Design a protein with these regions (language model features):
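Active-site acidic carboxylates
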Residues: 1-126
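Structural motif
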Residues: 93, 160-162
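Internal catalytic-core helix/loop-beta-alpha segment
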Residues: 113-114, 120-160
């Protein structure tokens, strides 16, 4: 896996240390039968503050991925377009927010912008694409995602996003 990073569109946002760390996981990769794209947390809160260095963006806006999020947009758009053209389902995840402050974490959601967890326009879902609203970090825990994957006959997931 690590040796193949050199040829991938994300190479410019993955630093050498991370490539080295993941060398021990190297193996042949492939997309299995009946795949789906799982677009994880491409919401506005990850992009807020613009393409500043991540630490700086996150200091100003908790949860911002700064320049990493913005650099990932073009390859993400390319992958989504290719998947759609091939008829591969695209499924999005985002956080469910109760603006009254009631949620499964200790975060005070009343301080959030009301659109903080809307998917950014640059990669927004197209008509008919599924959006899974989650309360925790996992797209699977406490959500109907697995039921949707089974109903759709999906047997392989290509994950992207935050």
């Amino acid at each position: 896996m690590a040796r193949e990073f050199e040829d991938h569109c994300w190479r410019d946002i993955i630093d050498d240390d991370l490539v080295e760390i993941y060398k021990s996981y190297e193996r042949d990769l492939h997309v299995g039968e009946r795949p789906a794209i799982l677009a994880i947390d491409l919401y506005k809160n990850a992009y807020i503050g613009g393409d500043k260095p991540v630490i700086e963006a996150n200091r100003e806006h908790a949860g911002s991925c700064g320049e990493n999020a913005w650099k990932a947009l073009p390859p993400t758009q390319k992958l989504l377009a290719a998947a759609r053209a091939a008829g591969v389902p695209v499924i999005y995840t985002t956080r469910h927010v109760d603006t009254r402050g009631v949620n499964s974490t200790n975060r005070d959601s009343r301080k959030l912008r009301t659109d903080a967890y809307d998917i950014v326009d640059e990669v927004k879902p197209q008509d008919g694409e599924l959006i899974i609203y989650k309360e925790r970090a996992s797209a699977f825990f406490g959500t109907p995602l697995i039921a949707h994957l089974n109903r759709m006959g999906v047997r392989s997931i290509v994950a992207l996003g935050e």
